């Protein structure tokens, strides 16, 4: 059993900050490829006019998710820009807003009273056409995840309300402010999965969210809210499943094969919006935190340049040492602040030069085994790292490098400050 590590949350101010609507960008930069799976191709050309919510890129492959225009206006450019989802440059569509806020009406809202008589394939298609992917960081297309084979009955739906990443509070604010909408989203998922038991798993430190979840979900049949002292790593779906149900998914199996589906809070919120409001995924809540005077939770249009958010929040861009997108432990230190917000941008963490305190420099491994004892999936990170440094990829594979969940704990606990997680993640990609 791994020694699960408690990491300082750094959420004191941000968790108290209500969700604010951030202004639409004058120019949106929408990456065509933001999910795990097949890449999309543009459906528009330079000079085309687009409306809010119009599908602008898609793929014919099953494991994919379209992207939509977050604003109305005109396509001015199609080219490459830095993509924080994959830490590399990829294709994007530039849209200059016209200020008209004209909406596309392709997705017709389904009334809550009609949910139970709506065919599952219609709901799956809606989730797919809305471009919904895992918003907890994984980025896997939700329509594929919820298309469970009929011979694999789902017994338990776990609502992942743990939000283990330090600094991140976007999910926590959704739990507080959009609790009823989360329940609506859960009802959609339960219908698709054959009405399994629901366990809402959250942390006791979310003192405002826990009673809200208990109040709203406590009225539902076969539904339980569990609040525990979860560690950071237990925010991962596979580790959370073990903490709640007492068993883990073998390396050669998926969660659904064990009768369980784990779904993130933000994803559930997006499902409710798509089904009942006819809204594609064109915005998300993201936490602005770190070396900032006032941490915030912002409802931001996908495609908003991160520089816009920094400037409009009076952050000195000349004092930036590092901007991390998508979580301190598992996110990406972006190469340019002109990179746009994506579906997977759960947070924007700002770290300044002026507040930087140099830490210990990298030294040789001291054979303490901290990384091994703290790995939540029982790997040997330092041995994998040493194999990769030597270019011995066969050995790394034999050490189960592909089972790494990229939690970053090994680097966090390493007294020698070896780049364990970064090296392993780079090799996996």
Which residues make up each language-model segment?
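Flanking helices and flexible, charged tails adjoining ferredoxin-like Fe-S electron-transfer domains
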Residues: 99-119, 123, 131, 136, ...
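N-terminal, Lys/Arg-enriched amphipathic/low-complexity engagement segments
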Residues: 1-43, 94
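Ferredoxin-type iron-sulfur electron-transfer modules in oxidoreductases and energy-metabolism complexes
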Residues: 346-362, 372, 376-429
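Short hydrophobic beta/alpha edge segments that flank linear recognition/processing sites
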Residues: 50-64, 79, 90-97
């Amino acid at each position: 059993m791994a020694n699960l590590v408690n990491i300082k949350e750094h959420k004191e101010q941000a968790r108290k900050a209500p969700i604010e609507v951030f202004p639409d960008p004058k120019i949106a930069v929408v990456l065509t490829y933001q999910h795990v799976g097949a890449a999309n191709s543009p459906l528009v050309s330079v000079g085309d006019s687009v409306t809010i919510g119009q599908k602008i890129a898609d793929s014919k492959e099953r494991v994919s998710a379209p992207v939509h225009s977050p604003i109305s206006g005109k396509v001015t450019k199609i080219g490459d820009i830095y993509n924080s989802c994959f830490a590399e440059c990829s294709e994007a569509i530039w849209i200059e807003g016209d200020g008209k806020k004209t909406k596309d009406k392709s997705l017709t809202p389904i009334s809550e009273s009609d949910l139970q008589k709506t065919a599952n394939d219609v709901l799956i298609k809606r989730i797919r056409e809305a471009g919904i992917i895992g918003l907890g960081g994984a980025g896997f297309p939700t329509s594929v995840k919820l298309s469970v084979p009929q011979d694999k009955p789902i017994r338990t739906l776990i609502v992942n309300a743990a939000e283990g990443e330090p600094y991140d509070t976007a999910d926590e604010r959704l739990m507080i402010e959009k609790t009823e909408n989360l329940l609506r989203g859960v009802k959609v998922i339960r219908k698709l999965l054959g009405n399994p038991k629901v366990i809402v798993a959250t942390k006791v430190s979310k003192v405002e969210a826990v009673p809200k979840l208990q109040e709203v979900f406590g009225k539902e049949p076969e539904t339980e809210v569990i609040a525990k002292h979860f560690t950071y790593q237990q925010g991962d779906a596979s580790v959370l499943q073990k903490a709640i149900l007492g068993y883990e998914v073998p390396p050669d199996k998926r969660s659904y094969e064990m009768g369980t589906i784990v779904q993130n809070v933000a994803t559930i919120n997006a499902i409710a919006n798509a089904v009942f409001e006819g809204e594609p995924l064109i915005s998300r809540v993201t936490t602005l935190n770190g070396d900032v005077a006032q941490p915030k939770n912002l409802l931001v249009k996908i495609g908003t340049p991160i520089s816009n958010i920094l400037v409009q929040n009076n952050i000195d861009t000349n004092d930036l040492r590092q901007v991390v997108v998508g979580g301190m432990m598992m996110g990406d230190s972006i190469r340019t602040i002109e990179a746009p917000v994506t579906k997977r941008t759960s947070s924007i963490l700002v770290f300044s030069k002026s507040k930087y305190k140099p830490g210990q420099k990298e030294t040789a491994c001291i054979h303490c085994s901290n990384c091994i004892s703290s790995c939540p999936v029982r790997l040997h990170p330092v041995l994998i790292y040493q194999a990769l440094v030597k270019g011995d990829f066969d050995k790394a594979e034999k050490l189960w490098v592909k089972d790494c969940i990229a939690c970053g704990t090994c680097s966090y606990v390493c007294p020698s400050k070896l780049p364990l997680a970064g090296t392993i993640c780079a090799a996996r990609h």
